[in-house]
A protein has these predicted regions:
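Residue-level detector of beta-strand structural context in well-folded domains
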Residues: 2-3, 25
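Well-ordered beta-strand positions
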Residues: 5-6, 17
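Acidic, low-complexity, intrinsically disordered interaction modules
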Residues: 15-63
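Short intrinsically disordered terminal tails
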Residues: 1-2, 73-81
């Protein structure tokens, strides 16, 4: 599922959290750790992500491909509902 996406103007990686398999948006730049709903999730200083379950439907709708095309988040929604 690893895919580069845009969310709030930032390039993040749509992936699954290694410990639980939950879908999340993983940082690609250390400066992204200050984004709303970003959580420290690991032992290494660069392990931060936003879990999709913590985003509202409207916030999830803001996740797009790198060219701005909205993503079909159906599979990820099924994992978090």
């Amino acid at each position: 599922m690893d895919q580069n996406v845009l969310y709030r103007g930032q390039r993040l990686t749509l992936t699954r959290f290694w410990a639980t398999g939950e879908p999340c948006l993983w940082i690609t730049d250390p400066e992204q750790i200050g984004m709303p709903k970003m959580e420290f999730v690991g032992g290494h200083p660069d392990e931060y992500c936003i879990f999709l379950k913590n985003l509202t439907e409207a916030e999830r709708a803001q996740i797009t491909s790198l060219d701005g095309t909205p993503l079909d988040m159906k599979e990820e929604r099924n994992d978090i509902e």
